[in-house]
From Swiss-Prot:
Organism: Cronobacter sakazakii (strain ATCC BAA-894)
Subunit structure: Homotetramer.
Lineage, highest ranks first: Bacteria, Pseudomonadati, Pseudomonadota, Gammaproteobacteria, Enterobacterales
EC number of this enzyme: 2.7.7.27
Alphabetized Pfam families for the sequence: Hexapep_GlmU, NTP_transferase
Protein known as: Glucose-1-phosphate adenylyltransferase
Length: 427
């Protein structure tokens, strides 16, 4: 591929996204979220009071100037597809802008679905080639972060890389869940191990390991060549982290891109924000952090908005019930269509159309859309799934044994409540 001559960074920031296509891998099940992903893919899980997890990757693309996007789906895709069709249909076909939905179709390899993340792209190569992009940006659809991909594209081009991997230091104890890399003084990746049992630490800090974020930029022709070779390799697991990136590393073609260089944040002195909300505790904690006085993730940055499907809902309402009890909230996010009647909500996140009846106390809870809470309930350190009806007088989050018997209780004490669990109680 012909390299661009050295140009002004602002010019490159405008040009490179137009030469790129983003592919969002959104077919993951998210098994560590337990029953929260029983009926939806992890990227379709609600987050932050009104969003879905995939909205962050999609918004990053739009804000970075990338308006050619493919979303690769597989597991429980209906909710995700519906959300994208309703909330992300504003692209201009005349301007060659689009969000293409690329579901698993069992088009090759007999009856198999996608065999891995790399195979998910391989099975759609005929479509992807038609985009005629010079650069392909591979993204995971299940992380919470704000990143300017145009800055990473500039880094990719200026280094003369054929593959660039976004990376971030993480505690060694957490690095087992990531691909871990080593780099030289020129940011070339010299070693890469996917999810090692004993992650190697960084030379400059033995408490941290340099982790891959699952965000890659490839020269398009180089990526197609790699995927075609991988497809013919019967011993491959057809995964970017396990197969493609190690191969690129050992051929000397991979470079690292430090996430702080392209992370978008209001406070330049703050730690770069990136979360894998793949466990119930991580999901619960990341939601509640948004309700704090100074959240780590700034959702109010008008220069980098997070977009989503906007429903026509009335404002949230806090009312006094007939007994004189006031509906009150503190340090919480309360979305449109919610009604809090004579109850107290503290340090919680309420998604649209939640109804909390009188004499309730809700503390450190995440209530997904359409939850109905009966009178005199107490909810603490819990996640209530969509459309659950909490019976009058129910107490959740105060008795560990009772919570574990009736619902799912994590080792950290976070209680997940779903409609099926409630139905079993009344059976």
């Amino acid at each position: 591929m012909v390299r661009l001559e050295k140009k002004d960074p602002l010019m490159l920031a405008r040009q490179l996204p137009l030469k790129s296509v983003a592919l969002i891998l959104a077919g993951g099940r998210g098994t560590r979220l337990k029953d929260l992903t029983a009926t939806r893919a992890k990227p379709a899980v609600h987050f932050g009071g009104k969003f879905r997890i995939i909205d962050f990757a999609l918004s990053n693309c739009i804000n970075s100037g990338i308006r050619r996007i493919g979303v690769i789906t597989q597991y429980q895709s209906h909710t995700l597809v519906q959300h994208i069709q309703r909330g992300w249909s504003f692209f201009s076909e005349e301007m060659n802008e689009f969000v293409d939905l690329l579901p698993a179709q069992q088009r090759v390899h007999g009856e198999t679905w996608y065999r891995g993340t790399a195979d998910a792209v391989t099975q759609n190569l005929d479509i992807i080639r038609r985009y005629k992009a010079e650069y392909v940006v591979i993204l995971a659809g299940d992380h919470i972060y704000k990143q300017d991909y145009s800055r990473m594209l500039i880094d990719h081009v200026e280094k003369g890389a054929r593959c660039t991997v976004a990376c971030l230091p993480v505690p060694v104890a957490e690095a087992r869940a990531f691909g871990v890399m080593a780099v030289d003084e020129n940011s070339k990746v010299i070693d890469f191990v996917e999810k090692p049992a004993n992650p190697p630490s960084m030379p400059c800090d033995d408490t941290k390991a340099l982790a891959s974020m699952g965000i890659y930029i490839f020269d398009a022709d180089y990526l197609y060549e790699l995927l075609e070779e991988d497809d013919e390799n019967e011993s491959s697991s057809h995964d970017f982290g396990k197969d493609i990136i190690p191969k690129v590393t050992y051929s000397g073609e991979a470079y690292a891109h430090p996430f702080p260089l392209s992370c978008v944040q209001s406070d330049p002195n703050a730690e770069p924000y990136w979360r894998d909300v793949g466990t119930l505790e991580a999901y619960w904690k990341a939601n509640l952090d948004l309700a704090s006085v100074t959240p780590e993730l700034d959702m109010y940055d008008q220069d980098w908005p997070i977009r989503t499907h906007m429903e026509s809902l009335p404002p949230a309402k806090f009312v006094q019930d007939r007994s004189g009890s006031h509906g009150m909230t503190l340090n919480s996010l309360v979305s449109g269509g919610c009604i809090i009647s004579g109850s107290v909500v503290v340090q919680s996140v309420l998604f649209p159309r939640v109804r909390v009846n009188s004499f309730c106390n809700i503390d450190s809870a995440v209530l997904l859309p359409d939850v109905w809470v009966g009178r005199s309930c107490r909810l603490r350190r819990c996640i209530i799934d969509r459309a659950c009806v909490i019976p009058e007088g129910m107490v959740i989050g105060e008795n560990a044994e009772e919570d574990a018997r009736r619902f799912y209780r994590s080792e950290e004490g976070i209680v997940l409540v779903t409609r099926d669990m409630l139905a079993r109680l009344s059976a």
